[in-house]
């Protein structure tokens, strides 16, 4: 009898696992930018662009976190920046926002080439 109860309990837990996983999957969007800088760009200019990216959560409510300290970068890129948006709508609304325009003042003049990835569940 105990074996039947244990088997039923385990079966119930296994059946509920996918539903629990779906409920805890975040709806946020991770926006990853890999970048190379224009020739002649100074370390101070690069740091200003990275620092500007880190300030974005305080300037745009739809951005919750920014990571700008690259540990490993491949493919000829110099840096990577990751921004976490609350959801896809926040990412779309960021385009053309005052926060983006302000950051672009320090970022775009020194950006050589960039690649962007937007990732969500």
Predicted regions and their residues:
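Residues in and immediately flanking transmembrane alpha helices
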Residues: 15-16, 100
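Surface-exposed, polar helix/loop patches in the mature regions of secreted/periplasmic/lumenal proteins
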Residues: 81-121
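Short S/T/G/P-rich N-terminal loop/turn motif that feeds into the first structured element of a domain
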Residues: 6, 16-79, 86-93, 119-121
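Positively charged n-region of N-terminal signal peptides that target proteins for export
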Residues: 1-4
């Amino acid at each position: 009898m105990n074996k039947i109860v244990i088997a039923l309990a385990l079966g119930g837990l296994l059946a509920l696992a996918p539903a629990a996983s779906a409920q805890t999957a975040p709806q946020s969007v991770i926006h990853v930018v890999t970048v190379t800088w224009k020739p002649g760009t100074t370390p101070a200019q690069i740091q200003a662009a990275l620092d500007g990216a880190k300030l974005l959560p305080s300037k745009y409510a739809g951005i919750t976190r920014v990571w700008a300290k690259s540990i490993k970068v491949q493919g000829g890129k110099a840096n990577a920046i990751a921004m976490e948006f609350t959801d896809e709508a926040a990412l779309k609304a960021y385009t053309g926002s005052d926060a983006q325009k302000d950051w672009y003042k320090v970022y775009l003049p020194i950006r050589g080439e960039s690649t962007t990835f937007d990732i969500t569940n």
